[in-house]
């Protein structure tokens, strides 16, 4: 058996322009690791959108050789924008290798059709992929015939957190990142959240040994030291941070991590600052959403504004080395424009965060996969929103967002207001980049100030392009060896 998993992250649209990708996705790495454990051969194709499609097809055909059991897959969990290009690649390969099986993985909605897709997995299905590859019956998990599509039961954790072991054929560098997970499951149930495993009181936590092995292998092979933590909430309990601190202690190098955290929990558990410092978790994404108590109660997140201000002051004072990014949702019922601007001005006046940004509330009312619908998506009226007939494409997942109105605004004006607030925060706080953007950039070009990073985006992208080109050349040589 030979398996290839193709993946690519979209260019990130920062407030200063497009930022090219320097991250490797953990899903493809983990699937390939699993195939090798099953006795097969496997490899990833990263930066798929940067390849010449004909050269890639020719190289893969050479690598497949005369193997009868061959599979090609793509990961749509983060970016499904290359599905059409992937379909073209598959058709080219099938001209000489008609036995090729095509797999779509991680998509949030059913994608493709049976004329070119053999099997599709919706959401997290690593356990089902393994069963399928080994020839076991997974029919009880099937949800569609066109293409044959499968998914795990809703909110039941059937697999373990991902901490991929990289392979020498990944041809990574110290200027790139990989993603790992400390746990699966988040005990919170925010009204706007549609993530897998939310409202789950029994998180599955990774072991120190597995995370150490993942990070240490990446360092030993490629010198990688920076890692995204993909957990929905890294600090919901102290034990997750204790695991990360122990991982950092056991590694032969000094790692650095970026993660999502809840600010209000840090306020309730100030000892978490020390744990984050021990772990070298210094880039933090706070989903603050709103500082209006009339909003935070309804969305089940946050608290009184003065308490939140005190928490930000504490983090700024006791954790000055941290890059803190706060994200806000514009248009939530219960908010108002005057109060919102007062809070934004307070953030800038006191420089309470390193960076902050916002986006207009999006409501998805007709997803094929209802499990990815938040409570607001499922019952907008209950939360004060009236849905109109108008829709618009919203983002790289292929979703259509519904236009809405509430007691103080509507989707159209919320987008306009969001743009104004976003630019105000970008200009008024030290950095114009989000936590993800900053972490990617400092991995690619470490040691610069926020002003310097803001001024050299074209240079950053040039370096990323050179990195990708070098990877592609090495991968072509390896596939054709």
Each language-model region and where it sits:
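Radical SAM enzyme core and accessory elements
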Residues: 2-5, 36-41, 57-70, 92-99, ...
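Acidic, low-complexity intrinsically disordered segments
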Residues: 2-216, 221-223
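Hydrophobic/aromatic residues located in beta-strands of well-ordered beta-sheets
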Residues: 3, 72, 102, 227, ...
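Radical SAM [4Fe-4S] cluster-binding motif and immediate context
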Residues: 23, 157-323, 330
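Short beta-strand/loop segments at the ligand-binding rim of alpha/beta enzyme cores
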Residues: 94-104, 254-257, 321-324
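Catalytic cores of alpha/beta
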Residues: 113-115, 333-349
């Amino acid at each position: 058996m030979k398996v290839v998993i193709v993946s690519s992250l979209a260019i990130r649209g920062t407030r200063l322009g497009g930022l090219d990708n320097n991250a490797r996705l953990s899903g493809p790495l983990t699937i390939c690791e699993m195939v090798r454990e099953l006795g097969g051969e496997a490899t990833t194709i990263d930066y798929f959108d940067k390849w010449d499609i004909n050269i890639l097809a020719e190289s893969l055909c050479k690598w497949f050789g005369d193997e009868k059991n061959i599979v090609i897959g793509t990961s749509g969990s983060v970016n499904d924008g290359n599905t059409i290009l992937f379909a073209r690649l598959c058709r080219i390969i099938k001209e000489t290798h008609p036995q090729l099986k095509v797999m779509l993985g991680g998509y949030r909605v059913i994608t493709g059709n049976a004329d070119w897709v053999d099997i599709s997995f919706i959401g997290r299905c690593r356990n089902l992929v393994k069963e399928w590859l080994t020839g076991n019956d997974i029919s009880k998990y099937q949800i569609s015939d066109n293409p044959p599509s499968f998914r795990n039961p809703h909110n039941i954790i059937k697999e373990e957190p991902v901490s991929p072991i990289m392979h020498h054929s990944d041809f990574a560098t110290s200027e790139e990142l990989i993603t790992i997970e400390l746990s699966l499951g988040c005990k919170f149930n925010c009204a706007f959240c549609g993530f897998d495993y939310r409202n789950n009181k029994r998180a599955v936590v990774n072991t120190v040994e597995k995370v150490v092995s993942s990070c240490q292998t990446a360092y030993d092979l490629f010198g990688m030291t920076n890692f995204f933590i993909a957990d929905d909430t890294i600090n919901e309990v102290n034990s997750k941070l204790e695991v990360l601190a122990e991982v950092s202690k056991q590694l032969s190098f000094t790692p650095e991590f970026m993660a999502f955290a809840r600010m209000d929990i840090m306020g309730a558990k100030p000892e978490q600052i020390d744990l984050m410092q021990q772990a070298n978790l210094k880039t933090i994404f706070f989903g603050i959403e709103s500082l209006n108590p009339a909003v935070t109660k309804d969305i089940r997140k946050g608290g009184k504004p003065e308490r939140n201000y005190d928490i930000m002051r504490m983090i700024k004072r006791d954790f000055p080395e941290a890059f803190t990014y706060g994200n806000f949702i514009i248009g939530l019922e219960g908010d108002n424009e005057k109060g919102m601007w007062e809070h934004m001005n307070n953030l800038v006046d006191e420089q309470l965060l390193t960076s902050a940004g916002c986006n207009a509330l999006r409501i998805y009312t007709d997803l094929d996969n209802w499990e990815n619908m938040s409570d607001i998506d499922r019952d907008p009226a209950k939360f004060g929103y009236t849905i109109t007939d108008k829709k618009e494409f919203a983002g790289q997942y292929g979703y259509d967002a519904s236009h809405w109105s509430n007691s103080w605004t509507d989707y159209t004006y919320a987008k306009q207001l969001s743009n104004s607030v976003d630019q105000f925060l970008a200009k008024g706080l030290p950095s114009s980049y989000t936590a993800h953007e900053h972490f990617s950039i400092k991995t690619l070009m470490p040691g610069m100030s926020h002003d310097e990073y803001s001024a050299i985006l074209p240079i950053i992208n040039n370096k990323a392009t050179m990195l990708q080109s070098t990877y592609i050349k090495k991968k072509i040589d390896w596939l054709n060896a």
